[in-house]
Structure formats: structure tokens, C-alpha cells
């Protein structure tokens, strides 16, 4: 919705500037009111310094708005990705192996594997008897 508003504002300013430069915009100035009072209607009066300055300002504003529109269209995601996964976020295959566990390090103790019996069928069983893994 914001893009549509910005584009429409850009279009309106462009049309206004085009009409302003062509002299079709109706502006009331002190010189034109004096011309109406005297009965002489001069439609295309010479542009005053004030009109030239405002036209220059409008052109500068239009160019700035055009630059802002082009910058908004070229926006790149600037958020820095975290090197660790946040709480509650799912791990994917790539980030799961790259997580370093620098917090608590456990002592590695080798226990002899105790196996009382070999399971006959591993498929379909919920747990293997006396095995850890």
C-alpha cells in the first residue's frame, strides 16, 4: 500500500512540475492581479525570480523523491543473521552442525558396553533392551 502511495505522489509531482514548466498552472501573483485590475490580461507573463526559484525547488524535490523511490526499490535486507539459533527456532541441517557448545563441557567417561542379550528383531520395537544411544 505504501508503494502505491509513493508512486502516486511521485506521479502527481511529475505532472505538476510538467504543467508548471509549460506555464499552464494557474498562479496568482501581484503582477497578474494588477493586470486584471487595469483590464489588460497577459496570460503568458514573463516568469519572475520567485517563480523560477520555486520551479527549481520543485525540480530538486522531484529529483530527491525519485532518488528515494529508486532507493526503496533497491532495498537489500540489512539484518545481520545470527550465528546461533534463537530459542524456539527450528534447526536446519546446515546450522545444526555449526553450533559450538562452549558452555559446560562434560567429562567423557568410557563405560564398558553392557549387553545382556542381542535383540532378535530391531524393526518395530520401541526400545532396545539395555542399550544406550
Curated annotation (Swiss-Prot):
PANTHER family: OSTEOCRIN. It comes from Macaca fascicularis (Crab-eating macaque). Interacts with NPR3. It is found in: Secreted. This is Osteocrin. The modification Arginine amide is found at residue 132. GO terms for biological process: cell differentiation; cell surface receptor signaling pathway; endochondral bone growth; hormone-mediated signaling pathway; negative regulation of D-glucose import; negative regulation of dendrite extension; negative regulation of osteoblast differentiation. One of its GO terms (cellular component) is extracellular space. Belongs to the Osteocrin family. One of its GO terms (molecular function) is hormone activity. Keywords: Amidation, Cleavage on pair of basic residues, Developmental protein, Differentiation, Hormone, Secreted, Signal.
Amino acid at each position: 500500500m505504501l508503494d502505491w502511495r509513493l508512486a502516486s505522489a511521485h506521479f502527481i509531482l511529475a505532472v505538476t512540475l510538467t504543467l508548471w514548466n509549460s506555464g499552464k498552472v494557474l498562479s496568482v501573483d501581484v503582477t497578474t492581479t494588477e493586470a486584471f485590475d487595469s483590464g489588460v490580461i497577459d496570460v503568458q507573463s514573463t516568469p519572475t525570480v520567485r517563480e523560477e526559484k520555486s520551479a527549481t525547488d520543485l525540480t530538486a524535490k522531484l529529483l530527491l523523491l525519485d532518488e528515494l523511490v529508486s532507493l526503496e526499490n533497491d532495498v537489500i535486507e540489512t539484518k545481520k543473521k545470527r550465528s546461533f539459533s534463537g530459542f524456539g527456532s527450528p534447526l536446519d541441517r546446515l546450522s545444526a552442525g555449526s553450533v559450538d557448545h562452549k558452555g559446560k563441557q562434560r567429562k567423557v567417561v568410557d563405560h564398558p558396553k553392557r549387553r545382556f542379550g542381542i535383540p532378535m528383531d530391531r524393526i518395530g520395537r520401541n526400545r532396545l533392551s539395555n542399550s544406550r544411544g
